[in-house]
C-alpha cells in the first residue's frame, strides 16, 4: 500500500509540474488580488498558475481585521463578492463586513473552479528575462522550506507570457526584477503610511504593467508607486485583481493577434 501511495503522489505531482512549466499567466501570491485575477483570467481560457509561498490561501485576509473574525469591503466591490458567492452584511456609510474565512475559501474555490492551478509552498526566487530591451518571460522558484533553511538549492523554471506580482506589501517579484535587471527601468519607492480612502482608489488606478511581461496588483501596487496603505479593507484588492486580469487578457490577445498577422 505504501508503495502505491508514494508512486501515485510522485507520478501526479511531477505531471503537474511538467504541465505547468509553461503557462500563459503566472501569478505570485494567493491573496485577494491574486486569486481574483486568477479566476477572471482562467474564465477567459488562459492557462493560469498561482504560486503561493505559504501552505494556505488568502494572504492578509485571515489576520486582516487585527485577527478579529470580520473584514470590510466597500460598495464598489460587491459585484465581485456576488461573482464568488460571498455573503456580506451592511455596516453603514457604503461599507460591508465579510467573514474572512468565507472570503478565503470562496476566492480560492472560485479560482480553482475556473481552471486556475494553485501550487502551495513555493518561493519565487528570481525572474527569467529575454531580449534587448528586456522582457520578463518567466520565474525561477524553489520550495519555501528550502528557502527558509538557507541551503543552496538551484531553482526550477516556469515560463510565462505574463507574470503578475500579487505578493503584497514588499512587491517581492518586482523587487528582484528591479535589482537584477536594471535595464527594465523599474523604480521601487515603497508604500507610504495609511490613508485608506485615498489608497483604495489609487491602488486600483495604478494597477497595471510595470515592464514588458511584468504586471502588478494589490498591495504591491502601493510599494511600486509609493502609495498609502489602507489596512483591513479589501475591496480595493479585489478590484485591483479584476482590473489586472482585464489588462493582461487584453495585452495577451493583442500579442497573439500580432503574431498571426
From Swiss-Prot:
InterPro entries: FAD/NAD-bd_sf, Thi4_fam, Thi4_prok. It holds the Pfam family Thi4. One of its GO terms (biological process) is thiazole biosynthetic process. Glycine binds at residue 229. It catalyses: hydrogen sulfide + glycine + NAD(+) = ADP-5-ethyl-4-methylthiazole-2-carboxylate + nicotinamide + 3 H2O + H(+). Keywords: Iron, Metal-binding, NAD, Thiamine biosynthesis, Transferase. Gene3D superfamilies: FAD/NAD(P)-binding domain. Its EC number is 2.4.2.59. It comes from the Archaea. Fe cation binds at residues 154, 169. Its cofactor is Fe(2+). Pathway: Cofactor biosynthesis; thiamine diphosphate biosynthesis. One of its GO terms (molecular function) is iron ion binding. It is an enzyme of class 2 (transferase). NAD(+) binds at residues 33, 52-53, 60, 124, 152-154, 219. Belongs to the THI4 family. Homooctamer; tetramer of dimers. Involved in the biosynthesis of the thiazole moiety of thiamine. Catalyzes the conversion of NAD and glycine to adenosine diphosphate 5-(2-hydroxyethyl)-4-methylthiazole-2-carboxylate (ADT), an adenylated thiazole intermediate, using free sulfide as a source of sulfur. This is Thiamine thiazole synthase. The lineage of its organism: Archaea, Thermoproteota, Thermoprotei, Thermoproteales, Thermoproteaceae.
Amino acid at each position: 500500500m505504501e508503495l502505491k501511495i508514494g508512486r501515485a503522489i510522485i507520478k501526479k505531482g511531477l505531471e503537474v509540474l511538467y504541465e505547468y512549466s509553461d503557462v500563459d499567466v503566472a501569478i505570485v501570491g494567493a491573496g485577494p488580488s491574486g486569486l481574483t485575477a486568477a479566476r477572471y483570467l482562467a474564465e477567459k481560457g488562459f492557462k493560469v498558475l498561482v504560486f503561493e509561498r505559504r501552505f494556505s490561501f488568502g494572504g492578509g485576509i485571515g489576520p486582516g481585521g487585527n485577527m478579529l473574525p470580520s473584514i470590510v469591503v466597500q460598495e464598489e466591490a460587491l459585484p465581485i463578492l456576488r461573482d464568488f458567492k460571498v455573503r456580506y452584511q451592511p455596516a453603514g456609510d457604503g461599507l460591508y463586513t465579510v467573514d474572512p474565512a468565507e472570503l478565503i475559501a470562496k476566492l480560492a474555490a472560485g479560482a480553482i473552479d475556473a481552471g486556475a492551478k494553485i501550487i502551495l509552498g513555493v518561493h519565487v526566487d528570481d525572474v527569467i528575462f529575454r531580449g534587448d530591451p528586456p522582457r520578463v518571460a518567466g520565474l525561477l522558484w524553489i520550495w519555501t522550506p528550502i528557502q527558509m533553511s538557507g541551503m543552496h538549492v538551484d531553482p526550477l523554471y516556469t515560463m510565462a507570457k505574463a507574470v503578475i506580482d500579487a505578493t503584497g506589501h514588499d512587491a517581492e517579484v518586482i523587487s528582484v526584477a528591479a535589482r537584477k535587471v536594471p535595464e527594465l527601468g523599474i523604480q521601487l519607492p515603497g508604500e507610504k503610511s495609511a490613508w485608506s480612502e485615498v489608497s483604495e482608489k489609487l491602488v486600483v488606478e495604478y494597477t497595471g504593467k510595470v515592464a514588458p511581461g511584468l504586471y502588478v496588483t494589490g498591495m504591491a501596487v502601493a510599494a511600486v508607486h509609493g502609495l498609502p496603505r489602507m489596512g483591513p479593507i479589501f475591496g480595493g484588492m479585489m478590484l485591483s485583481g479584476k482590473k489586472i486580469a482585464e489588462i493582461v487578457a487584453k495585452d495577451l490577445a493583442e500579442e497573439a493577434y500580432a503574431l498571426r498577422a
